[in-house]
Amino acid sequence: MHLRKLRSKPVTRVAVTALVCSAALLDASLAAAADGGPKAFSADALPTWQTEGIVWSMAAANGVVYVGGTFEAVRPPGAAPGRKLVARRNFAAFDAVTGKLLPCAPSFTGHNHTVRAMKASPDGRVLYVGGSFDNVGSEKTANVVALNTADCSVRRDFKPTVSSTVRAVEPTDRAIYLGGDFGRVSGQTRSRIAAVSPKGALLPFKAELDQPVRALSAAIPQGRLFVGGDFERVNGQSARSLVTLNPVTGATVLAYPGWYPSQSSVKTIAQDNSRFFVGAEGHGPGIYDGRIAGRTATGIMVWNDTCRGATQSVLPYNGVLYSASHAHDCNETPGGFPDRGDRQHFLAQRVEDRRILHWFPDTNGGLGEQVGPRILVVSRGVLWAGGEFTEVNEQPQQGLTRFGDKDTGAPEEPPTLSLSASEPGKVTLAWRAAWDRDDAVLTYRIYRDGKLVVTKAKSSAFWDRPKMTWTDSVAAGSRHQYAIEVTDGTNTAARSRSLTVNVPKKPAQTTTAPAQGAPAQGAQSAQTTQPDEPAQPAKRRGSGAR
């Protein structure tokens, strides 16, 4: 489901700008339970080049990340739109680890001039690229091309002609499967799916689909080719959005009845050692926007995640399923969140049981359809994402971003402290929990007169920031200053401004009813010290329904 963008005003804090916690003080078992499992990546974005347009596809081979889409140039990290541009026509290549722009830069031009799909051969020597283009560099092409990854040259022995847009490419050792909008390949009828040899010759594989193909994933040892898209009929039979075909003949193996309602479309398919994962988007009531896991060998569903918000890409990695979407209602998914009118554009889930893990980097919707991220790929331990977005973690960043394993960011929404002294010898501190993009449990350090007096750990998330309190015991009639800071165990925010409180000498007494506006006889007034503005629940940039 597509949503429109909402903006929230930053909350002004007068008192505490605290953040995050010391690893030595963090309760490891509490953190593990709250986070739900291991995550390979921090939520803190690495410096990354940007595109002057939309990224539709990415692929990785030999430590290089290839990027395709609709753009005329790229620009360095931190550069504003239109500044420091380097020409790259719908295709660019980067070092996966350093992010450095590489010289591999064939221009993809012609009708619609858009790169929609790419994937490397199993040995990493060839990059197959599909889309809507007529020329690659000086070579005439027809919507698909093969590049040598060693030198970025066009393979002239690979010359299939495809009549319309190629939206999915799946290379295997013996065949390259193509999916998209087309009706003919190399002069012969092929309805939206085809297979060619590594030399580009059309293979006998043939299937009939009534609407475009958008995702392909081959499991050759199991004799299966997973196909996803907009279709409702395959080979003359009902098969809505997802089907498994015989990779040699194109005959239907499995049709997955009941998995997807009408007006839903499978956009992405990926596999790990024994499972396949599918993501979909839909339009209108009763659609399916989430992710499904199934057994590769049998096609049996393992779990079904009903988060709403148009899934564009799924990527299993080290026991975690990463996804790009604009999730806005995951209330029925373990570890999920309710619909608050905003979006979360990246998710991480345990592959075993779909539980959402505490990993919440984010983007805005950005350009075009305002979907946000469109594609994910991992290379050399770095997660890359591309799409329509123009912001990452509420900072300007267009088209591309990436995440490594180093946690560099302090928690969001620092707590605002208030003090209350209503009885002799007691000071009560109150604040609302902060939250962090990749750590559920944060530790709060409380300082009295500049000295650490207590630490308290608490789990929180952007949709759930509980109120916290702590009562200090001090001498009656004394005067003290308090401050707070919060840490995620790696990064700690600056300590808050100190607040001062006077502690009563005697308990408050009420012996007679006072006149209006006068204090009670014998009563000593309690003191409450607060910032100018009370704490607010987390507000994030997001989107509303469209």
Predicted segments with their positions:
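Short linear segments in intrinsically disordered or otherwise low-structure-confidence regions
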Residues: 518-524
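Extracytoplasmic surface signature
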Residues: 2-5, 9-16, 22, 26-506, ...
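Arg/Lys-rich low-complexity patches in intrinsically disordered regions that function as generic
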Residues: 539-543
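Extracellular mucin-like PTS domains
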Residues: 511-512
